[in-house]
Amino acid sequence: MCDAFVGTWKLVSSENFDDYMKEVGVGFATRKVAGMAKPTLIISVNGDVVTIKSESTFKNTEISFKLGQEFDEVTPDDRKVKSTINLDGGALVQVQNWDGKSTTIKRKLVDDKLVLECVMNGVTATRVYERA
């Protein structure tokens, strides 16, 4: 199911992330620090529970979830959201909902790279990770 995503991934490129964070409502100072961070993602699967750890100089976060089951998440910019992650066409598609707002984060494998597409209100950021 999600085994292809398992491993350690390092950020190698980021496009339009500041504009995306601005659309989400992240403040200026947090956007600047987060934009400079080069996170490492560690993805693991234990039974039907998927864990995604993000480690960076900005903040370390960890989410554990079962596909299709809503869970509470505190995002790196301290938003308290309700998240649901599904496997759709080989991609992990996460929807975060908070305060009447919604954003989608799609994680997919392209040429052995992990590509994140973050979308809110038509603003898209693309972040590419390679296996560490």
UniProtKB/Swiss-Prot annotation:
The keyword Phosphoprotein applies. Its main location: cytoplasm. It is found in: Cytoplasm; Nucleus. Signal peptide: none annotated. The modification Phosphoserine is found at residue 13. It comes from the Eukaryota. GO terms for molecular function: long-chain fatty acid binding; long-chain fatty acid transmembrane transporter activity. It holds the Pfam family Lipocalin. One of its GO terms (biological process) is long-chain fatty acid transport. Keywords: Acetylation, Cytoplasm, Lipid-binding, Nucleus, Phosphoprotein, Transport. The modification Phosphotyrosine is found at residue 20. The modification N-acetylcysteine is found at residue 2. Belongs to the calycin superfamily. Fatty-acid binding protein (FABP) family. Monomer. Homodimer. Interacts with PPARG. Forms a beta-barrel structure that accommodates the hydrophobic ligand in its interior. This is Fatty acid-binding protein, adipocyte.
